[in-house]
Amino acid sequence: VTVALMWEARAVAGRGGELLDWARRQTLAQEPMRRETFRAPQDRVLVVTWWDAAYDADLPELPEPDGSLVTRTVHRWRFEQVADAPAPG
């Protein structure tokens, strides 16, 4: 099963670049199959990691950044991959 972990944080206004640099520097205890980092307006950063694991597996996640860098606690989501529906017809 492929599991995707999503980690999203919002930096204090004008500090999105610092948050992005911080997220890129974070290492995990295990290497995921894939890791991608995104940015968005309002100084937001998203990191998605993909794992070959059960949905409820104990997987390493990025920590909370220093409170002076972010406006709120990190949002975290976990998803499992499902097969695409067959094309109609």
Explain the meaning of each model-derived region.
Residues 1, 33-46, 62-89:
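Glycine-rich beta-strand-turn "strand-cap" elements at beta-sheet edges
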Residues 17, 52-61:
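Short amphipathic alpha-helices within nucleic acid-binding modules
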Residues 11-34, 62-65:
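Short amphipathic alpha-helical segments
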Residues 2-11:
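Short glycine-/aliphatic-rich beta-strand segments at the starts of folded cytosolic domains
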Residues 7, 50-51:
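Signature tryptophan residues that serve as conserved aromatic anchors
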Residues 13, 41, 54-55:
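Feature marks short, surface-exposed loop/turn motifs that line or immediately flank catalytic pockets
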Residues 2, 27, 57-60:
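Soluble, non-membrane globular domain cores that form compact, hydrophobic packing
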